[in-house]
Structures are given as C-alpha cells and as structure tokens.
Amino acid sequence: KVHQVIGAVVDVKFRVPVGAGTLGRIINVTGDPIDERGKIGLFGGAGVGKTKVALVFGQMNEPPGARARFTQAGSEVSALLGRMRGISELGIYPAVDPLDSKSRVQQMLQEYKS
C-alpha cells in the first residue's frame, strides 16, 4: 500500500546501484553511498523489481530500530553500520549494538576495535 500511495503522489522510478563495487557498501535510499569509501558508479542501474533487495516496513508504534531495519544481499545494515568509523558524527546509529550480540560479528568487531 505504501508504494501505491507514493505512486499516486509522485511518478518516480527508483534506480539501485548494482555490481561488485556495491558489495559491503552502505547506501542510502537515493542510491548514494554514505560510507567513507567515496562514490560508486551505477553500473547502468537496475529497476528495484530486478534486484535482490528486501524492504521491511514496521508500524509507527514499534521502536525505530525495528522500523528501519532491512536486509540487503543477506547482510544486516545494522552490522555494517557498526563497522563504520565516525558514524555517530553523521547522526546515524545502528539499530542493534553489534558488540552486545553473541555472534561472529561481535568477535570481529572486538578485534577491529582493539
């Protein structure tokens, strides 16, 4: 229903950067990278329906972390954000503290931090 509302108000075609240069990158909703590795090419772009991106929307009465989480290519955005240096200066905070999780991500981040 959300895409129907957006489509009724604005006629927009979404383009998503695709290719090896986007793997492991943090990309905002407009397709621009927000990590510290700089710009990437669009590789011709692709329609959202042709990519393997899943957007999950939550209700407004849920916590912000639950609403904003989505999975892209099998990687949790919150885990990727936890690896980025100086992310709090950009005003972006991970939905889950990766150092509190009991996983391989926790071990990797603790080694990276020290």
Curated annotation (Swiss-Prot):
Keyword Chaperone: no
A Gene Ontology cellular-component term: proton-transporting ATP synthase complex
Uppermost EC category: translocase
Cell compartment(s), UniProt: Mitochondrion; Mitochondrion inner membrane
Residues that hold ATP according to the record: 44-51
Description of how the protein assembles with itself and partners: F-type ATPases have 2 components, CF(1) - the catalytic core - and CF(0) - the membrane proton channel. CF(1) has five subunits: alpha(3), beta(3), gamma(1), delta(1), epsilon(1). CF(0) has three main subunits: a, b and c.
Summary of the function given for this chain in its UniProt record: Mitochondrial membrane ATP synthase (F(1)F(0) ATP synthase or Complex V) produces ATP from ADP in the presence of a proton gradient across the membrane which is generated by electron transport complexes of the respiratory chain. F-type ATPases consist of two structural domains, F(1) - containing the extramembraneous catalytic core, and F(0) - containing the membrane proton channel, linked together by a central stalk and a peripheral stalk. During catalysis, ATP synthesis in the catalytic domain of F(1) is coupled via a rotary mechanism of the central stalk subunits to proton translocation.
Protein name (Swiss-Prot/TrEMBL): ATP synthase subunit beta, mitochondrial
